[in-house]
């Protein structure tokens, strides 16, 4: 999709509403505004930065806890390219390039399904493997985001392009339909209630933010989750993925277990060598696969484009999914407009 403004879209301009103000909703809004195809673009959300799930994420570019893997690969590659073209050179974004290693204690001869989409993918060298690890992957040009800086950056970008943000909690999608014919649903876990999607559930993630730093991200998700993610101003240690757990309070038990696992993949981050700055908990929008599709309501007179269920890969697929979501809006508009034209003649 062309990120520059264009008037090639033959559909009449409409007022577009996006529900949700995490990295998915904001990215989608920015892509919509850059297209120049909409009369206005607004975001309604129950929670705004810095109080979103996105603000509590480790924010490493790497496909993680997300399906379907073939499309995740495509959207991840598109997101990586967007970071390179539009974000990485802006210091206000809090985004930096860091090498990423995923490591394995057992031989892992198969490559990930998303490998064909990532040109920089390679097998890890022996010198990149900690003691006790025998195999691994490497990406030399991955990205990490300081989440608070990055989310503020997205808000500023959205508003500077003319976007409007309103803190508003929807309990019924029909509230949105009063003034909008097209809505993009980026509510994540909120889709469980707003759209009665019982296939989405929380994947509780707890992270530890420390002052120390390192030169690469490293992760082990083979048996238990352990990762070290150096960001611009701090480093994140993680983590957990406790399915169907709604507890948003940090627990001492999880903190202790995270520190033990992290010390195994990177001994320099043993408990007695780090300075803890904080502990955060976020609920990942876990689902069997990302939902990115059109759904018509009220007999075909209203269109909802769903863009949720990104699991642990929200920052990894955000721009690719945003581009796809706006394509779906444009594809659904002719049917919507045809239906409304017929109704107006009755």
From Swiss-Prot:
Amino acids binding FAD: 22, 24, 52-54, 58-60, 187, 284, 311-312, 314, 316
InterPro entries linked: D-amino_acid_oxidase_CS (IPR006181), DAO (IPR023209), FAD-dep_OxRdtase (IPR006076)
Catalytic EC class: oxidoreductase
Protein's cellular compartments: Peroxisome matrix
Binding-site positions, D-dopa: 284, 312
Chain positions recorded as D-proline binding sites: 227, 284, 312
Lineage top rank: taxon: Eukaryota
EC number(s) on file: 1.4.3.3
Protein name: D-amino-acid oxidase
Lineage of producing organism: Eukaryota, Amoebozoa, Evosea, Eumycetozoa, Dictyostelia
Gene this chain is encoded by: ddo-1
